[in-house]
Structure formats: structure tokens, C-alpha cells
């Protein structure tokens, strides 16, 4: 289970251990959703989610989110803490990069962006809304081989 007391290295190692288990389920889910999305030519919202619980007791959400012409594919799990919730995500289903969205970041995003502009996220949680609206991100490598991103 991902908890807020884990270090970034521990979170990354745990996520990569789960990835080998998730890979086949991700491929099957993508095939199903992509086929349905192409067949029905949706205009508007198309949301499909699947929750997979691994042997390590991590609940991963695989989400296919489409809004009008654009769509995004997310693989993420919550990082549970005492008060707030962060997320750990995988960047792709082939050669994943583990992305950590800290509880502090998610709390500030809710306070300073969603609440400030009175935005309704609809059926999306804050992480899904952020990922859907900020898909143009620049990943920058740090000297310790970790990344941070600029959106």
C-alpha cells in the first residue's frame, strides 16, 4: 500500500513491482476502450475506469478519459495519508516513468486553482482533471536521475 510516509525511492520501487502485474490488464482495457471510442465517435465526455488491486494491496485505477476530440490515458494509485491524498502515476503502458504527485501539490491545486476559479470537475477527481487539462508538460531530469515537470 502506498502511504505518505514512504520515500520517493520506495514509492518508485513499489510501483515498478506492480507494473509487471498491471501490464496485461492495461493492454486489454485499452483495446476495449479504444475500440468502443472509435466505433461510437463520441462528441462530449467518454469516461471509462477500471480499478485493479494487486497482491501488494495497491489499488490502481486505469482510466480512459475523453473530452470532445482529445483523450488521455491514466494509470494511477492514491498515496494515502492522514489528512490529504496524493497520487503516484505511471506515464505510459510500455516504458513507464513513475510520477509522484505529492499531497501538498494536490491540496494547493485544489485550493489555488479549482476553488479559486470555482471550477466544477464533474465526474473527474482533482488528479484526473489536472491530467486532462495539463497534458502539455515538460519533464526535466535532475542530477540524481529523478524528474520534475513544468506544466
Predicted regions, residues:
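Ribonuclease/tRNase effector modules and their secretory precursors
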Residues: 1-151
